[in-house]
A protein has these predicted regions:
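Catalytic machinery of carbohydrate-active enzymes
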Residues: 1-315
Length: 315
């Protein structure tokens, strides 16, 4: 999400050059942004408080920044923030809104309202440094031939993932009329998707076969991406592709809908008052039944791709 905000920020401020400091494997997310230098770091080289002091010294020496923006606000960046402030740098930090998140995820709160989107919170960091930013809230469709549908059926946490039997049935139905491409990561996910590919004609498993840059390019070439509330939804935004997103214990009210993606393309159980019970999907279901996922009908997804065409699972 940050990459799209940074791109628009830099477009609106041609006088600014930005140094993005993050883990090396995120470099491909920022490659196409003019006037951005990506500084990849290995956290193993900067352990503990002394490691953060070492990193801060290296960054100050190499880049001599005018100001510092913290878009993450985690333990490591909190240490860096303090070090840079002690050195006299102006530092702006994202406000994650802990209190409003707690109110939103209170299962007894029956009057839940959307909180400020994460992309606007990113933009606020730059605004607080004196740079006005107006976000378009639109992703940019790449000028490529689009065909096929992508399906990323996995998520990091149980509370965000449609039951695999539902995703499998969805794949079986969609592959009758569309070329279908599976996305995933890790050995277990790859093995499952390989099995699906063998069982379902007109499908291709891409899990474990592409670099991040290649994955972004493939997503850009898709007509539609189907994803859980996961990184693949945000990759679709970065690649300029419409994404139908599935939400379980999480909710787009928390501000994490993919940049430029439409609420109309959200699939969820609307009338469950306990949702969202979690911001990241990492909490156990207090009901014990994960109704937020079990009650999703895959026809909801099919209707957004093939309006008016009813499909029924084989007995």
């Amino acid at each position: 999400m940050a990459a799209l905000v940074i791109r628009e920020f830099l477009e609106q401020h041609p006088e600014v050059e930005l140094i993005m400091v993050s883990r090396e494997h995120f470099a491909d997310l920022f490659k196409a942004i003019p006037r951005l230098t990506f500084k990849g770091v290995s956290l193993d080289d900067y352990k503990g408080i002394f490691g953060m002091h070492k990193l801060a010294k290296e960054l100050a020496t190499e880049f001599n920044p005018d100001v510092v923006a913290d878009l993450h606000d985690v333990i490591r960046t909190k240490i860096l923030k303090r070090i840079f402030r002690e050195k006299g740098y102006k530092v702006s930090v994202i406000d994650k809104g802990k209190e409003e998140r707690e109110i939103l995820t209170d299962v007894w709160n029956l009057d839940k309202k959307p909180i400020r989107s994460t992309v606007e919170k990113y933009a606020d960091v730059f605004r607080n440094l004196g740079f006005p930013v107006e976000l378009s809230h639109e992703f940019r469709i790449q000028q490529v031939q689009k065909s096929g549908i992508g399906l990323a059926p996995f998520a990091q946490h149980h509370g965000k993932m449609l039951p695999l039997e539902k995703s499998y049935e969805l794949a079986r139905i969609l592959a009758k009329k569309h070329s279908l491409f599976f996305f995933g990561g890790g050995k277990n996910e790859t093995e499952i998707l390989e099995e699906w590919q063998h069982k379902i004609p007109n499908t291709t498993n891409l899990a474990g076969k592409l670099t991040l840059q290649q994955e972004l390019q493939k997503i850009a070439e898709l007509e539609i991406m189907i994803s859980m509330d996961s990184a693949n939804m945000h990759l679709a935004s970065l690649a300029g592709t419409r994404c139908i997103s599935v939400w379980g214990s999480t909710h787009y009210f928390a501000g994490f809908l993919g940049y430029g993606q439409k609420i109309e393309d959200v699939v969820h159980v609307k009338d469950l008052t306990c949702r969202p019970c979690s911001i990241f999907g990492d909490k156990e279901c207090y009901r014990g039944d994960y109704a937020c996922l079990e009650e999703i009908d895959i026809q909801q997804i099919i209707d957004k791709i093939q309006p008016g065409e009813k499909e029924f699972a084989e007995e």
